[in-house]
Amino acid sequence: NCSFGQNVYIGKAKIGNFVKVQNNVSIYDNIIIEDYVFCGPSMVFTNVYNPRSAINRKNEYKHTIIRYGATLGANCTLVCGIEIGTFSFIAAGALVNRNVKPYALIAGTPARQIGWMSTYGERVDVPLSGNEEWECPHTGEIYKLEGEDLKRLI
């Protein structure tokens, strides 16, 4: 039930259902991609934190986890050993070197959180921290910001 573009390499990785991988993406060993993840064209997963040509570090591959429904934009780079949260959204060209919260909108080099995204892919109109609620105009889902964490109310 997955879709893979041209020039896609898959190592010993675990890939869920309904994942869409665009052209020119390499998915190395120890990467876990949960269901409904989107990997944009030419996005990059790294597998060794401190590579050197003269040193074999194949036994040092770090685990990277991409949670359910996340979007990884075109040409973004994920440094190995991190977790990308459920329904988070990584902007095109971002360099991500730390864990990402669920529903977070991440952009820049190095990447930082600039907002929140809904499951529909709509920007959630709440600040990065505080106590607020927002209703998605497309789905009617309610999102609640509690401190620095956003939750979808079911």
Residue ranges and their predicted role:
Residues 1-84:
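Flexible, glycine/small-residue-enriched loop-and-beta-strand segment within the central core
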Residues 44, 95-96:
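Conserved sequence/active-site signature of Rossmann-fold short-chain dehydrogenase/reductase
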Residues 44-80, 109-154:
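C-terminal segments of enzyme domains that contribute to small-molecule binding surfaces
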Residues 85-88, 101-103:
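Conserved catalytic segment of ABC-fold P-loop ATPases
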Residues 86-89, 95, 143:
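Internal alpha/beta core interface subdomains
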Residues 90, 108:
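Conserved G/P- and acidic residue-centered "switch" motifs that form tight phosphate/ATP-binding loops
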Residues 98, 107:
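HATPase_c (GHKL) ATP-binding subdomain of two-component histidine kinases
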